[in-house]
Amino acid sequence: MTGTGAGNKPLSHGLIIRWSDVFEPESILIEDPFAVRESILATRSREAVVSGLRQVELYTYVSKACGATGFSTGIAKFKPGAHLPYHAHKFSEAVTILEGRARVLVEGRVYRLGQYDCAHLPSGVAHQVENEDPEGELVCHWAFATSTPVRELIDRQFPIDDRGFGNPTSADPETIVRYESDAIYELSKDAFFLDLFARRFGAVGICGGHGRFLPDASLPCHIHDFDESITIIKGTAMCLVQGRRYELSDCDTAFIPKGLPHRFLNLSDDEMSMVWVYAGSEPDRRIVDAHYCSGELTWPGADLA
């Protein structure tokens, strides 16, 4: 499918899409000679996989279904007191807290995480996530180093070692990155970033972090050598991909394939923030001419730009 309007006509350059006007929940939105396609995954169109007597809702955004290679992303919503029982994966996972307070158990080691704190769980390490708030909802962003997300339940109990708001020791396989101001850097004017998981934090095949954009802030037009997922967790973002414009908010997620020029802007009067994830172990961006993002120049491909 190449469009979301009447008659399934291709979307014209410069069209701003608001999700209240979109009829198809998950559309492949471009058709070009390079066969490179972005997707916009709207929050209101996601269907939850329910766990634990409807206490935990798991939503998948980016995955093999939209063309992603080597990674997947989504969110999990926990009702008050709910938990996702011990499980493990055969790949890296990163869990970032978006709302609420989490209690994360890693083979008995217990950590408490607040907003934008992140836990990286290596392959094969059993872990459990709980909403320790008896009244409020817990919302987490998850990222897996596979395009086909799956969880293997672990029927085992571990002795408790409560670390509170502490961090793992050098002997522990997991990593906790706290959202602390001294680690935040200004990637572009008024755009402040914090790397939450990457190879240097133990992750294999994925990296990502949090980005906060003040009004009128933006990133320059750029490309990556790997696929990217961008989830807008606060405010409203404008996403430009080769002249196509998409408006995202409320955890709407953009999937940007490898080598496709794109940029994000905050054109609102309020702050905007995102969780970004790359299908690579360390972040890397290649700046290209802004006219490739605006659509004024035709993208020749990464090898020719």
Feature map (PLM): residue ranges:
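Extended, hydrophobic interaction surfaces within ordered domains
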Residues: A94, A102-V106, V110-G164
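Glycine- and acidic-residue-biased ligand/ion/polar-headgroup-sensing regions
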Residues: S92-E93, I97-A102, F226-E228, I232-A237, ...
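Short acidic-glycine-tyrosine-enriched beta hairpin
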Residues: G108-P122, G243-K258
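Conserved short histidine dyad/triad with adjacent acidic residue
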Residues: Q55-T60, G74-H89, G209-I223
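A short, N-terminal "cap"/entry segment at the start of jelly-roll beta-barrel domains
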Residues: T2-T69, R151-G205, D289-A305
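A generic "binding-loop/recognition-motif" signal
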Residues: K90-F91, R109, V125-A126, D225, ...
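Residue-level marker of beta-strand positions
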Residues: H83, C118-H120, A126, S218, ...
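Ligand-binding loop in jelly-roll beta-barrel domains
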Residues: A68, S123-V150, M238, D250, ...
